[in-house]
């Protein structure tokens, strides 16, 4: 919501981005990430009047700097390990190795711990929802920008083709090639 962002910037003393401190956005030097960084930079300038310096880095350097907390803005990519909100929310626990922005919120940690112990799925999801609300409302934790997808062309000779939705991988265990009943 660019209008709301402009309003909040003005309330913070930066009308139209004037006087806003310099920001550097670090990202891996891959084409997709470069394209995305340039698009974000243009949107921040056009919508908010904020100048953002772009810094492309080798993947290993970018990850190491992010993990050490040496960044203002950084690109992070995450693919779910399993189809559950916990796989995304767990990385913001205070003691999680993927907590690159060093979120430290006892209330959030407690809700996540409770969700991990809860056996009732409905109650567990409610705890996860509460934890997510704490992140969204009380912390600047991360902003989902991109959701990748794949397109698969599958021969009509293949049956039982199935994608694992959490990792976008083909489940090959039950794939069948051709009609085995017509063999002689």
Language model region names:
Residues 1-11, 29-35:
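Structural transition elements
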Residues 11-19:
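Surface-exposed acidic, glycine-flexible loop patches that form ligand/cofactor-binding
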Residues 20-22, 49, 140-142:
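Active-site lining segments that contact anionic ligands and/or coordinate catalytic metals
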Residues 20-29, 52-55:
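Short, well-ordered beta-strand elements
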Residues 31-43, 64-184:
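Detector for C-terminal structural segments
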Residues 39-54:
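Short alpha-helix C-terminal cap/hinge motif
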Residues 53, 57, 75-76:
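Short beta-strand and adjacent tight-turn residues that come in two discontinuous sequence segments
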Residues 59-62:
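Histidine-bearing beta->alpha loop at or near hydrolase active sites
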């Amino acid at each position: 919501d660019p209008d709301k962002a402009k309003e909040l910037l003005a309330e913070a003393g930066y009308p139209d981005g004037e006087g806003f401190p310099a920001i550097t956005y670090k990202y891996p030097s891959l084409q997709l990430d470069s394209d995305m960084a340039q698009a974000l930079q243009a949107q921040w300038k056009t919508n908010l009047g904020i100048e953002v310096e772009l810094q492309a880095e080798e993947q290993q350097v970018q990850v190491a700097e992010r993990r050490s907390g040496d960044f203002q803005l950084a690109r992070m990519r995450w693919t779910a390990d399993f189809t559950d909100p916990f796989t995304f929310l767990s990385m913001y626990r205070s003691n999680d190795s993927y907590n690159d922005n060093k979120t430290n919120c006892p209330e959030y940690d407690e809700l996540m711990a409770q969700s991990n112990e809860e056996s009732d799925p409905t109650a567990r999801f409610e705890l996860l929802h509460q934890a997510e609300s704490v992140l969204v409302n009380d912390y600047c934790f991360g902003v989902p920008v991109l959701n990748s997808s794949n397109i698969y062309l599958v021969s009509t000779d293949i049956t039982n083709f199935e994608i694992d939705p959490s990792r976008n991988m083909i489940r090959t265990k039950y794939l069948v090639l051709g009609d085995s009943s017509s063999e002689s």
